[in-house]
Structures are given as structure tokens and as C-alpha cells.
Design a protein with these regions (language model features):
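Flavin (FAD/FMN)-binding glycine-rich loop and adjacent Rossmann-like elements that form
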Residues: 1-216
Length: 216
């Protein structure tokens, strides 16, 4: 309370605690601790219970008279679980690289000037002509999966995926076989940036640069 009053900022009244010690990129993961995949109910339940117990143990170490517990997290924060084996998997070194079949441009949420074009091939597989995906379930490796999984890229790839389906139905073909020129024109007509302007590349950077901040 004193910090909130001194700073004239009510947000200073609140503190948050996490169950585990690992950060967004996997640093701080306890040695010898297995990873939760989040692909079945038992795994998700084990993750949830253990993290809640760790969180309560941390709270018990705090002075009880100095704060009230307002809420405990009720949603497992599993950010990457599984994705398709697409025709192409977006790579960390694809920053500033152009793709002929790009359907949108996204950026690294940690460093907004790291630009990626997302090729249609990351959203589908020719072996499954009626299957397409978006966001974190699209094909990507390493840190590129982190870049692709967050909400703005999920929105853009989701919009592209929906439009691909409409074009596939109209053209009578699989999702990987749509006329890419017509698709890109339709996306651009909807104000979607399909290819980034090279003038947006910061000085000292170039296509094929690896953007990685420590993903395991």
C-alpha cells in the first residue's frame, strides 16, 4: 500500500507470483525436471496441480497480515504443445526473408523490428488437402514457434487460413493448391501486409538473420 501511495499508482498495490521458476524461454527450469507436453488430460492435470502447490508454498512464505490473495490462476499456461508437419516449418533464421507464397507479415513480440513473412506452406500439408491451421499449431521450429504462436500472428494467419478455405472451395482444389496470386491479392485488398517493404529492415540487418533470444 505504501508503495502505491508514494507512487500515486494503484497498480503498485498488486503483486504476482508464479508456481515455477522457469521464464518464457525456458531459462530457470529445474534441473532434472521433465517437461509438460500438454497433449493429454493427465499431463495437463499434473502440471496444474504441481504449479498450484508451488504457488501456495510461495504465498505461505509471505507475511499474512500484509496482503490478501485475490485470485489464483485457473488456466494452464501451455503456450506451445504440438503443431502440424507443414510443407515448410518457419525457422528462427527466416527473419527479414521473403517468401513467394507469403500470406502475412508478423514480428517478434520481444523485438518488434524483427519481421517475418509467413508462407502458406506453414499452414498446410499437401497430404491433407482439406486441413489448414493457424497460430501456434502452424509449422515452426525453435524460437520461430514462439514468434508465430502469439495472438497477433494467430489473428493474421487465421484470417489467411479462412480465406484459403474460401478460395479452395471456389477453385475446387486442396488448400495447398490455391492460386497464390489471387489469394495474396484478396489479402492485400483486406489491408493485410503480405510482403514487407525492405525499407523497414533496420540498418545492420539482412534477410536470413537468426532471431533467437534463448528458446530451449
Amino acid at each position: 500500500m505504501r508503495r502505491a501511495v508514494d507512487a500515486n499508482d494503484v497498480a503498485r498495490m498488486f503483486r504476482d507470483f508464479t508456481g515455477g521458476s522457469a521464464n518464457l524461454y525456458g531459462s530457470g527450469h529445474p534441473e532434472g525436471k521433465s517437461y509438460w507436453k500438454g497433449t493429454d488430460g493427465r499431463d495437463v492435470t499434473a502440471y496444474f496441480i504441481e504449479n498450484q502447490l508451488d504457488l501456495l508454498a510461495k504465498l505461505k512464505q509471505q507475511p499474512r497480515s500484509q496482503r490478501d490473495v485475490l485470485i489464483l490462476p485457473m488456466m494452464p499456461q501451455l503456450r506451445t504443445t504440438c503443431h502440424i508437419a507443414g510443407e515448410y516449418a518457419l525457422q528462427p533464421e527466416d527473419a527479414y526473408r521473403h517468401f513467394a507464397d507469403s500470406v502475412c507479415v508478423i514480428n517478434d513480440f520481444d523485438r518488434r523490428d524483427y519481421l517475418y513473412e509467413v508462407p502458406l506452406r506453414t499452414l498446410c500439408c499437401r497430404d491433407f488437402p482439406n486441413l489448414i491451421t493457424a497460430g501456434r499449431s502452424a509449422a515452426a521450429d525453435g524460437y520461430a514457434w514462439d514468434v508465430l504462436r502469439v495472438i497477433p500472428p494467430a489473428i493474421l494467419t487465421g484470417q489467411a487460413a479462412g480465406l484459403v478455405c474460401a478460395h479452395a472451395m471456389r477453385e475446387g482444389c486442396g488448400v495447398a493448391e490455391v492460386d497464390i496470386g489471387k489469394l495474396q491479392a484478396a489479402l492485400e485488398a483486406a489491408d493485410v501486409m503480405v510482403h514487407f517493404d525492405d525499407r523497414l529492415i533496420p540498418d545492420g540487418h539482412q534477410g536470413g538473420e537468426r532471431a533467437d533470444v534463448g528458446h530451449l
